[in-house]
């Protein structure tokens, strides 16, 4: 054990020790190292670096920094670089101000960058240690800062550089060819001199460039506007924007693209939006009038670049669209054809839908504006709901020529677009019910499928409450068909005769159909009256407790008519007749399709040849308004439908006028439909007032029901809040006025459904 300890002890005594590196150097030696490095730096700046040993220079720089002489090395470097840039480089650049300035500056910049890379490599250890410890700029950046301050930003060099670049760009804008590479190099230099920032580039070039550009484009805009149409101006602005983007891409820093484009947009678009849009014979309205979708698309694309650009376009488009719409719906020309009226609106909508798709990129703002405009002018005319229903009526009737089912479907879809814009949907519903009833009862529907498809569209739009009555009408028609089959079987089984009358009865549910509460009187002739009484007894025997009321205004009849007189030509000679069934030399037979009122009038003439207006009124008991309309259809309609003659021969029906059968009546058709006067023109003024009164009565009930529903749920509400809630609930059908809502609230208070609170009379409570 003792030997081991000795051995261990002797190894410890002979262990090597490393002596600490001396931290101080002789000043003379330090100066000699610096002189060596200084000379090398100067040689590099003079581009005489071929004989230098970079390894030796690195080692000497390393030694200086290691021995805490980094500050001397850093300060010395700054002085040497500064001296070279001031005495040599700056002088060369100043001498070139009037000759090859950019090339000289660019060469000096490239040489300086190359030199600083070499110097940085030599002084790499100083960058890693001294620069990090003392938080100063690294070698390369120090070189950039000195070049920036002593050369590029030196008084007249800075000004001359800026002016040279601006002049070159101005010349290029005028069409001259310039050295783009020189501009690009100068801009890259300014960006690098910003040391990862844009300040140098921005202050020395970009800011004055944008200012100069604004002045240039301001003058150019005046020239462009004076010399060009709107579409050409737009194309020139587009070209100018593209040119500036292309210049940035090839010459300037990419960060300049956004500000220069904004300058162009401000000077060429924003400041002149109204002028461009309203240009006479070439602006937006001109483009819309002439369907210039491409020009509109160019304008949209350009104006979408600037704030409020699309708003300016929209406002101008809206003014034009409203003018067009108001002209279409104006009530000046009474007797306007409803089908043409709606078709005109649909054509206008199609035009603007095309602009929306092809020119305005289906833009939401334009879409909403167009919809708002259509809603505005469609509701200016109180007859719009009636006319829309008549338009649909026309498309769903049998005999619409040249339209496939798919085409009818497309038209109905377009009609539904107008329906959505309509505020008085309840008025439309009332008219639609009337027109549907007429189609169903006269068997004029093109098909049940088309009818049900239309009702389905209305249901999707407004809900099942809106269409429940319309669907009920179809159920009634189906049940009536079954009832008539049973009635005919009953007649066969009992041998009861209807006296030659082919009777079809439709039993209608009062709530579904547009029946009249006060049914117009009419003395039905004995034969059809007798036939109906047989049906009445049959029906009531099956359905005890029910009541049947004849709705004369909804009925129709086919009459066998025989005309005996000769047909005369204008020269007085008599002619035979083609088309009618001729039984004798001059006897002609036709089937006349007429209303119940017209049938009642015509069957009088089986008894006598002549009747005065008063006699017809007394015999038939038809209300005067209905009688006048029926007689106008029979005696004052088209010659091919004039089955009665009237004395005197005027278009008006008045007391004392005498009516006889027109024995000279002829038609190429065996089956002649006697049109009701003005049937396609919509209701007369008195009828419209009556319809409006019925609508107003219905609305009172709907408003009251909505008020009660809301108050039952909320119990207590302030007046304005209740009015707003009621309006919100009913707007899908109509827009109730606050005045009407207030009246209905007062009515409910009187009937003790609601009460005012004692502390605030504008607050209501629900009375359970």
From Swiss-Prot:
Positions where Phosphoserine occurs in the chain: 585
Subcellular location: Nucleus; Golgi apparatus; Cell projection, Cilium, Flagellum; Cytoplasm
Originating species: Mus musculus (Mouse)
Gene Ontology cellular-component annotations: centrosome; Cul3-RING ubiquitin ligase complex; cytoplasm; glutamatergic synapse; Golgi apparatus; mitotic spindle; nucleus; plasma membrane
Positions of crosslink type Glycyl lysine isopeptide (Lys-Gly) (interchain with G-Cter in NEDD8): 712
Molecular function in Gene Ontology: cyclin binding; identical protein binding; Notch binding; POZ domain binding; ubiquitin ligase complex scaffold activity; ubiquitin protein ligase activity; ubiquitin protein ligase binding
Disulfide bonds: none
Annotated segments matching region Interaction with KLHL18: 2-41
Keywords (A to Z) from UniProt: Acetylation, Cell cycle, Cell division, Cell projection, Cilium, Cilium biogenesis/degradation, Cytoplasm, Cytoskeleton, ER-Golgi transport, Flagellum, Golgi apparatus, Isopeptide bond, Mitosis, Nucleus, Phosphoprotein, Transport, Ubl conjugation, Ubl conjugation pathway
Protein's job: Core component of multiple cullin-RING-based BCR (BTB-CUL3-RBX1) E3 ubiquitin-protein ligase complexes which mediate the ubiquitination and subsequent proteasomal degradation of target proteins. BCR complexes and ARIH1 collaborate in tandem to mediate ubiquitination of target proteins. As a scaffold protein may contribute to catalysis through positioning of the substrate and the ubiquitin-conjugating enzyme.
Cullin neddylation domain span: 698-760
Pfam families in UniProt: Cullin (PF00888), Cullin_Nedd8 (PF10557)
UniProt modified residues of type N-acetylserine: 2
Subunit structure of this chain's protein: Forms neddylation-dependent homodimers. Component of multiple BCR (BTB-CUL3-RBX1) E3 ubiquitin-protein ligase complexes formed of CUL3, RBX1 and a variable BTB domain-containing protein acting as both, adapter to cullin and substrate recognition subunit. The BCR complex may be active as a heterodimeric complex, in which NEDD8, covalently attached to one CUL3 molecule, binds to the C-terminus of a second CUL3 molecule. Interacts with RBX1, RNF7 and TIP120A/CAND1. Part of the BCR(SPOP) containing SPOP, and of BCR containing homodimeric SPOPL or the heterodimer formed by SPOP and SPOPL.
Membership in a protein family: Belongs to the cullin family.
Biased composition (Basic and acidic residues): 682-698
Protein name per UniProt: Cullin-3
Region (Disordered): 677-698
Tissue: Widely expressed, with highest expression in brain, spleen and testis. In the testis, it is mainly expressed in spermatids.
Post-translational modification: Neddylated. Attachment of NEDD8 is required for the E3 ubiquitin-protein ligase activity of the BCR complex. Deneddylated via its interaction with the COP9 signalosome (CSN) complex.
Consequences of knocking out this gene: Null deficient mice are not viable. Extraembryonic ectoderm shows a greatly increased number of cells in S phase. In the trophectoderm cells are blocked to entry into S phase. Embryonic stem (ES) cells form tightly packed cell clusters with prominent actin cables and aberrant adhesions. ES cells are retained in proliferation, yet retain their pluripotency.
Pathway: Protein modification; protein ubiquitination
Name of the coding gene: Cul3
């Amino acid at each position: 054990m003792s030997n081991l300890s000795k051995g261990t002890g002797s190894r410890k005594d002979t262990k090597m020790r490393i002596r600490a590196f001396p931290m101080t150097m002789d000043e003379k030696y330090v100066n000699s190292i610096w002189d060596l490095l200084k000379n090398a730096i100067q040689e590099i700046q003079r581009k005489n670096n071929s004989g230098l040993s970079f390894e030796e220079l690195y080692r000497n720089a390393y030694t200086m920094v290691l021995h805490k002489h980094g500050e001397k090395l850093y300060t010395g470097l700054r002085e040497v670089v500064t001296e070279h840039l001031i005495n040599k480089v700056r002088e060369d650049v100043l001498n070139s101000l009037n000759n090859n300035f950019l090339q000289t500056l660019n060469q000096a910049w490239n040489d300086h960058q190359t030199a600083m890379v070499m110097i940085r490599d030599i002084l790499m250890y100083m960058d890693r240690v001294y620069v990090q410890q003392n938080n100063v700029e690294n070698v390369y950046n120090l070189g950039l800062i000195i070049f920036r301050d002593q050369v590029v930003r030196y008084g007249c060099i800075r000004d001359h550089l800026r002016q040279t670049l601006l002049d070159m760009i101005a010349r290029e804008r005028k069409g001259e060819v310039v050295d783009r590479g020189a501009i690009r190099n100068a801009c890259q230099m300014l960006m690098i001199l910003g040391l990862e920032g844009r300040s140098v580039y921005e202050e020395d070039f970009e800011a004055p460039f944008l200012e100069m550009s604004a002045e240039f484009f301001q003058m150019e805009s005046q020239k462009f506007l004076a010399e060009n149409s709107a579409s050409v101006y737009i194309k020139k602005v587009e070209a100018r924007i593209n040119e500036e983007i292309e210049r940035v891409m090839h010459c300037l820093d990419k960060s300049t693209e956004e500000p220069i484009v904004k300058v162009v947009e401000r000077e060429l678009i924003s400041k002149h939006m109204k002028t461009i849009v309203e240009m006479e014979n070439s602006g937006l309205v001109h483009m819309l009038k002439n369907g210039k979708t491409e020009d509109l698309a160019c304008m949209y694309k350009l104006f979408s670049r600037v704030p409020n650009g699309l708003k300016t376009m929209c406002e101008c488009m809206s003014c034009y669209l409203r003018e067009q719409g108001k002209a279409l719906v104006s009530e000046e020309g009474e007797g306007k054809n409803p089908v043409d009226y709606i078709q005109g609106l649909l054509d206008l909508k199609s035009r603007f839908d095309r602009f929306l798709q092809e020119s305005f990129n289906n833009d939401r703002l334009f879409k909403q504006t167009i919809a708002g405009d259509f809603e505005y002018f469609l509701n200016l005319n109180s007859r719009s709901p009636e006319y829309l229903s008549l338009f649909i009526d026309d498309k769903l009737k049998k005999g619409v020529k040249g339209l496939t089912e798919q085409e009818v479907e497309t038209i109905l879809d377009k009609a539904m677009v107008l329906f959505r814009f309509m505020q008085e949907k309840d008025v439309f519903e009332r008219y639609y019910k009337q027109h549907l009833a007429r189609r169903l009862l006269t068997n004029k529907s093109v098909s049940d499928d088309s009818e049900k498809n239309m009702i389905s569209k209305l249901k999707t739009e407004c809900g099942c409450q809106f269409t429940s009555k319309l669907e009920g009408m179809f159920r009634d028609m189906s049940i009536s068909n079954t009832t008539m089959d049973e009635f005919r079987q009953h007649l066969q089984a009992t041998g009861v005769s209807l006296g030659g009358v082919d009777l079809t009865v439709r039993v209608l549910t009062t709530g579904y159909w547009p029946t009249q509460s006060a049914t117009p009187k009419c003395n039905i002739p004995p034969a059809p009256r007798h036939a109906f009484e047989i049906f009445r007894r049959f029906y009531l025997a099956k359905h005890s407790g029910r009541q049947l009321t004849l709705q004369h205004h909804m009925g129709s009849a086919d009459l066998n008519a025989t005309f005996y007189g000769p047909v005369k030509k204008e020269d007085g000679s008599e002619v035979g007749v083609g088309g009618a069934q001729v039984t004798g030399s001059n006897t002609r037979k036709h089937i006349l399709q007429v209303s119940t009122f017209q049938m009642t009038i015509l069957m009088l003439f089986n008894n006598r040849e002549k009747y005065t207006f008063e006699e017809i009124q007394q015999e038939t008991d038809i209300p005067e308004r209905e009688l006048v309309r029926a007689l106008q259809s029979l005696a004052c309609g088209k010659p091919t439908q004039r089955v009665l003659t009237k004395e005197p021969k005027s278009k008006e029906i008045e007391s004392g006028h005498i009516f006889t059968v027109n024995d000279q009546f002829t038609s190429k058709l065996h089956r002649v439909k006697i049109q009701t006067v003005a049937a396609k023109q919509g209701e007369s003024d008195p009828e419209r007032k009556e319809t409006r009164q019925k609508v107003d009565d219905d609305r009172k009930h709907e408003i009251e029901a909505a008020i009660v529903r809301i108050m039952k749920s909320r119990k207590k509400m302030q007046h304005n809040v209740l009015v707003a809630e009621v309006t919100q609930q009913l707007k899908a059908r109509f827009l109730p006025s606050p005045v009407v809502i207030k009246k209905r609230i007062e009515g409910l208070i009187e009937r003790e459904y609601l009460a005012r609170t004692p502390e605030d009379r504008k607050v209501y409570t629900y009375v359970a």
